[in-house]
UniProtKB/Swiss-Prot annotation:
Keyword flag Iron: yes
Listed InterPro entries: Fe_traffick_prot_YggX (IPR007457), Fe_traffick_prot_YggX_sf (IPR036766)
UniProt protein name: Probable Fe(2+)-trafficking protein
Any single GO BP term: cellular response to oxidative stress
Annotated Gene Ontology cellular component terms: cytosol
TM region(s), chain numbering: none
Gene3D superfamilies: Fe(II) trafficking protein YggX
Superkingdom assignment: Bacteria
UniProt KW keywords: Iron
A single GO molecular function term of this UniProt record: iron ion binding
The organism's taxonomic lineage, starting at the top: Bacteria, Pseudomonadati, Pseudomonadota, Gammaproteobacteria, Pseudomonadales
PANTHER family: FE(2+)-TRAFFICKING PROTEIN-RELATED (PTHR36965:SF1)
SUPFAM superfamilies recorded: YggX-like
Amino acid sequence: MTRTVMCRKYKEELPGLERAPYPGAKGEDIFNHVSQKAWADWQKHQTLLINERRLNMMNAEDRKFLQTEMDKFLSGEEYAQAEGYVPPEK
C-alpha cells in the first residue's frame, strides 16, 4: 500500500515520497509533508527557474535563492516565476 501524506502545498491526502529527498531535518520535513505530485511539480518549476534565470548551482547565492523558492513553492506561498517562459499550447 502506498504511503500517503497531508500535502502542505495541495492541502489534501496524496501519495508521499518514497524517501527523503535531502538529508537531515529539511529532508524529513519534506518527506512527511510533501506529496509526490508537489515534489514533481517543484522539480519542473526548479528546472524552469535554473534555465530562465541562468542560475549557476556552483554559486552559493543562486543555491540559496533556489532553496528559498522551494520552501515558498512547497508551502503554497507566492513564489518566483520564470520570466519570459511561455508554456506550450496543448
